[in-house]
Design a protein with these regions (language model features):
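Phosphate-binding site of ATP-dependent enzymes
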Residues: 159-244, 265-272
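ATP-binding N-terminal substructure of ATP-dependent carboxylate-amine bond-forming enzymes
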Residues: 1-93, 97-106, 110, 122-133, ...
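ATP-dependent carboxylate activation and anion-phosphoryl transfer catalytic cores
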Residues: 2-7, 109-112, 235-315
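A short glycine-rich, hydrophobically flanked beta-strand micro-motif that places a catalytic Asp/Glu
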Residues: 42-46, 178, 182, 256-268
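ATP-grasp fold ATP-binding core
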Residues: 108-109, 135-153, 176-185, 189
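Glycine-rich phosphate-binding loop of ATP-grasp-fold ATP-dependent ligases
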Residues: 23, 116-120, 142-167, 188-190
Length: 315
């Protein structure tokens, strides 16, 4: 196995998920940044020929930059393990846990982390009476999410029975299970985790979007539609608690190397944990690189560090 600047690094991106386009943008950025440290960086499309392409490239380490299933849910990670290839990021189990919001919330609850109240609606169970029961239990301000999508794909808000039924129907286009949560009013906050000697919480980021909008797919990936405030202007106790919960969520899922933990933080009280992303976006508008930069870790150094960790595990 080659080490140092002579290591062959394969950046795998793209695929067929709803987030494939974002993945390609992230992948190009990662590959360009890695080229500052490593002489041999190849970019490989995640398609039916990915195995053949990896065998031809003979990488010393793989850097998956894949968003959504089947690249982020443990499937590709398991494939790499069958090939005996070291890779950046969380392993099979943690990737699968994090991608499924229902499973992840079960693990977070077991760890005693602060969560929004929720209900799970599965395909074939979305009867009017069942949805009425969800409204009665959670109240009229709801967030509806496909269980296994990222980048806010398929997410809708609902206030009435009709809106809830429409939102659940739309979410079923992406998944067989839908997570319905009470909508908490507060700031949209994210805390990035980077493992060095230990899992370290980077500076907390607040995401601000124009009034009347929220951090949906368009606002995540369109220049100028969102503002990243670093460090997030939270009271000291909330700020510290957000970082603490982020570390605990990373550990609860068994994540490795890096993750991004999303929250809504109300005006007072606990930050509410929403989800953990095991392969955060690495685009020019993404949160994770901004948090790392604020911690004194420029993008080129960040991605090189992640590759070096994977190489160290394999040696």
């Amino acid at each position: 196995m080659a080490r140092g600047e002579n290591a062959v690094v394969a950046v795998v991106c793209g695929g067929s998920s709803a987030e494939a386009g974002v993945s390609r943008v992230s992948g190009r950025g990662v590959a360009d940044a890695l080229a500052a440290t490593f002489r041999n960086v190849v970019t490989i499309e995640y398609d039916n020929a990915v195995g053949e392409a990896l065998c031809e490239a003979k990488p010393d380490v793989v850097f998956p930059v894949l968003h959504g299933p089947p690249g982020e849910d443990g499937t590709f990670q398991g494939f790499l393990e069958t090939l005996g290839l070291p890779y950046v990021g969380s392993g099979v189990q943690a990737s699968a846990f994090a991608m499924n919001k229902v499973v992840a919330k079960g693990l977070f609850a077991r760890a005693g982390l602060p969560l929004a109240r929720d209900a799970v609606v599965r395909r074939g169970q979305a009867t009017p009476s069942a949805l009425d029961g969800v409204l009665m239990r959670l109240g009229p301000r709801l967030v509806v999410k496909p269980a296994s999508q990222g980048s806010a794909v398929g997410v809708r808000f609902a206030r009435t029975a009709a809106e809830l039924a429409a939102a659940v129907k739309a979410a079923f286009e992406f998944d067989d299970a839908v997570l319905v949560e009470e909508r908490i009013e507060g700031r949209e906050i994210t805390a990035a985790i980077l493992e060095r000697r230990e899992a370290e919480a980077l500076p907390v980021v607040e995401v601000r979007t124009p009034e009347g909008s929220w951090y949906d797919f368009e606002h995540r990936y369109t220049q100028g539609l969102s503002e990243h405030i670093i460090p997030a202007p939270l009271p000291p106790e909330q700020y510290a608690r957000t970082q603490e919960v982020a570390r605990e969520a990373h550990r609860a899922l068994g994540c490795r190397d890096l993750s991004r933990v999303d929250f809504v933080v109300p005006a007072s009280g606990e930050p509410i944990l929403l989800e953990v992303n095991t392969i955060p976006g690495m685009t020019p508008t993404s949160l994770y690189p901004d948090a790392a930069k604020a911690a004194g870790v420029p993008f080129e150094r960040l991605v090189a560090h992640l590759v070096e960790r994977a190489l160290d595990r394999a040696s």
